[in-house]
Amino acid sequence: MAILNLTQHAATAEQVAQGVIDLTGDDLGTMKALLTFVGLPSAETVHERAYEVAKLAQAHDVESVMIGGAPFFMGALERALQKRGIKPLYAFSERVSVEKVIDCVVVKTNEFKHIGFVEVWL
């Protein structure tokens, strides 16, 4: 199953292995412009942009999309996608603690490991 990436970030190797496809070219630029809000948006702007993003996804003939970003936008985007028969998914990651020895010093970092997707139910 192909999952179209509708986030502003490139899919990770783990996500690609699970079927995520990144947008490219003009479609990527259009999507990023629609997802970038400068200043406080009106409800009308939020809904118009959600509609446009959903229309972009529909043009790619996919059943599922990976979404994520500004919380105030996600609800409108979920509904716009579902009205077009497209299933919105959120990536789910687990934080993994990793210890590395660098110059005889143990450095502990957190990395995020992609586990799967959470389907939106309305």
Where in the sequence are the language-model features?
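Long, low-complexity, Lys/Arg-enriched
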Residues: 1-64, 76, 83-122
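Conserved residues at the C-terminal ends of beta-strands
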Residues: 68
